[in-house]
Regions:
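Short amphipathic alpha-helical segments that mediate assembly, nucleic-acid/protein binding
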Residues: 19-22, 229-233, 254-258, 273
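Helix-loop-helix
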Residues: 223-224, 228-233, 238
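Short N-terminal helix-initiation segments at or just after the protein's N-terminus
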Residues: 234-239, 264-268, 306-312
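Long, charge-rich alpha-helical interaction segments
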Residues: 235-264
Length: 399
């Protein structure tokens, strides 16, 4: 069945704050003898575990930094997609503790929409996501789109969608330091360039034809993976508040110690990618099917890679070097990531079979255990069928 997607780009309204109380709180915060002000905004932010997920929650932490002391409280939870329902149930059980609940970079489905709509205080929840969504009519508190609201003809990410929301906030407007504003915008763009894999498609371009985000985006992701999460968030916040905000770039040939560390780690990652690709297992499948009254011979070639950590670079390099492969599966612990560069194949259909999701070219799902036999012929019959958008009754024989 054809996968149809209705994308909504609804404008979520601004954070609701009493401006008079905000000004009063700011004045009080300048007075040392005064006790801490009561919170004007109690926020919970639920997001994914990757760079885009943490990039979004870092923006909330930045927002809190510019509130008067004690005027905003923030609770964050970075989780796997399959934990969202349980997290929302717990959140709704304590909904009176929050004025605003933000969900970012976690795929929207009908179950989530129904859960939020059914709750009497569901209007406290704002959702920002860029994955494929099949829910036809999304409420106004959902911003779901694959397209960038800021950059024409570009793909977006959750960090950018959320940034587009909070930069209209009254408190954000109080950030008068233009260097800090530029740093935040640059950080958001680096996250977008990496999460959409835009940097990969421009890696062979002339350095004069692209901006520094294409260099800094993969370095930022490397930094994300080599640092403890709290260390990473702390480092990024310091970087964003610093007057020398270009510390991640190579502008005018000025290398910093962190740039060198990232380069060394990136070289290490490149060697790991090469090692993982050499371990790829090819799995050919041939099928005879009946569809639309005709006999079709399908011949798929799949590459399976078991890796310590999943990486789109591993899969995309594999597909680029092995043009005969129809799609590539990278298995890391109990996570399976699937990629394809063939226009006729939609790997998000594959991921849905196992309760996952994603995009046409890249998707993923979680399995309870990893075993090489999981990728045998019988297991992949339904995967092959779905990759070609076939019906189960169409399969006649498997050679």
């Amino acid at each position: 069945m054809e996968n149809t997607t209705n994308l909504q780009n609804n404008q979520v309204e601004n954070i609701s704050i009493d401006e008079a109380k905000l000004i009063e709180a700011m004045n009080k915060s300048l007075d040392e003898p005064e006790p801490p002000v009561s919170p004007l905004l109690r926020m919970k932010h639920i997001s994914h575990l990757d760079l885009d997920g943490y990039g979004s929650t870092i923006l909330s932490e930045i927002l809190m930094h510019f509130y008067p002391d004690g005027a905003m409280t923030l609770e964050t939870a970075n989780i796997l997609p399959n934990k969202l329902s349980a997290e929302m149930e717990e959140t709704f059980n304590n909904i009176d503790n929050y004025d605003l609940v933000v969900i970012t970079d976690l795929a929207v489905n009908q179950k989530l929409v129904d859960m939020i709509n059914a709750h009497p205080k569901g209007n406290k929840v704002k959702v920002f996501d860029h994955h494929l969504c099949e829910v036809a009519d999304l409420p106004s508190n959902f911003t779901v789109t694959e397209k960038s609201p800021i950059r024409e003809n570009k793909l977006t990410c959750a960090t950018e969608l959320y940034y587009n929301f909070i930069r209209n906030d009254k408190v954000y407007s109080l950030i008068h330091n233009q260097n800090i504003r530029k740093a935040i915008a640059y950080f958001v763009e680096c996250v977008r360039v990496y999460d959409t894999f835009e940097f990969w498609n421009t890696r062979n371009d002339s350095i004069n034809e692209i901006d520094m985000t294409y260099f800094d985006a993969p370095r930022l992701n490397t930094l994300f993976h080599i640092m403890d999460r709290d260390e990473f968030k702390s480092y990024i916040r310091e970087y964003l508040y610093s007057p020398n905000w270009e510390c991640l770039t190579q502008s005018n040939g000025n290398y910093t110690w962190i740039t060198k560390v990232l380069e060394l780690e990136q070289n290490k990652n490149e060697k790991y990618v090469e090692s993982a690709i050499r371990r790829m297992v090819r799995t050919p499948f041939k099928y005879t099917i009946y569809k639309d009254g005709k006999v079709h011979e399908l011949d798929y070639e799949i590459g399976v890679i078991f890796a310590e950590k999943s990486s789109p670079v591993i899969a995309n390099t594999t597909l680029e070097r092995n043009t005969d492969l129809d799609f590539c599966a990278v298995v890391s612990n109990n996570q399976v990531s699937i990629y394809s560069n063939k226009p006729e194949i939609d790997v998000s259909n594959i991921a849905k079979i196992f309760g996952g999701g994603g995009h046409k070219e890249a998707a993923g799902f979680t399995i309870p255990y990893v075993n090489a036999s999981i990728f045998n012929m019988q297991h992949f019959e339904k995967i092959i069928m779905c990759a070609g958008q076939l019906n189960e009754e169409d399969i006649c024989t498997a050679d």
